[in-house]
From Swiss-Prot:
The keyword Nucleus applies. The keyword Repressor does not apply. Keywords: Cytoplasm, Nucleus, Ribosome biogenesis, Transport. One of its GO terms (cellular component) is nucleus. Residues 10-35 have a biased composition (Basic residues). This is Ribosome biogenesis protein ALB1. Component of the nucleoplasmic and cytoplasmic pre-60S ribosomal particles. It comes from Scheffersomyces stipitis (strain ATCC 58785 / CBS 6054 / NBRC 10063 / NRRL Y-11545). It is found in: Cytoplasm; Nucleus. The gene is ALB1.
């Protein structure tokens, strides 16, 4: 037999089960009565049957044509002319900002060198290096073999 304060006492088990059952019944009744929201349904449920979140803008959804289907609750899903004009004006400003951003990116790309410029610069470097090699073989450049210092430019004593 379980001790006096045991969690597994038969009386506590029966009461806990009854309590959980009552809470489950209330939860099911609430789910049947209220329309389902995006947060109360699974992620694979039909989205069109769910009510919008309070943070979702109904006006923007109506303006873009993405308004959800009615969920049984009477709602006013009209968009006033004033609000529609405001949304159109804001959309125009958003498009303008996007276009200005693209223009600034193009202005900054002025110093991009083309393939021809890169090849011509490479040819100049090759030509200069080969002239040094040819002049060295002819004896025009004197290389000091007994020079002091290291290849890192630090003098060693």
């Amino acid at each position: 037999m379980a001790s006096k304060n045991s969690i597994n006492k038969p009386k506590i088990k029966i009461n806990a089960h009854s309590h959980a059952k009552t809470l489950g019944r209330k939860r099911a009744a609430r789910a049947r009565k209220n329309p389902s929201t995006k947060s109360s349904t699974s992620r694979y449920a039909e989205v069109s049957g769910t009510a919008t979140k309070p943070s979702d803008s109904t006006a923007i959804a109506l303006y873009t044509g993405e308004a959800p289907k009615p969920t049984g609750v009477v709602t006013n899903t009209t968009l006033s002319n004033k609000r529609a004009k405001k949304l159109a004006r804001n959309q125009k400003y958003i498009d303008q900002r996007k276009n200005e951003g693209l223009g600034k990116e193009h202005e900054m790309d002025v110093e991009v060198e083309t393939e021809e410029q890169r090849q011509s610069r490479l040819e100049q470097i090759k030509k200069a290096l080969w002239s040094v090699v040819q002049n060295q073989s002819e004896g025009l450049y004197k290389v000091a073999v007994d020079a002091e210092g290291t290849t890192l430019g630090v003098q060693a004593f």
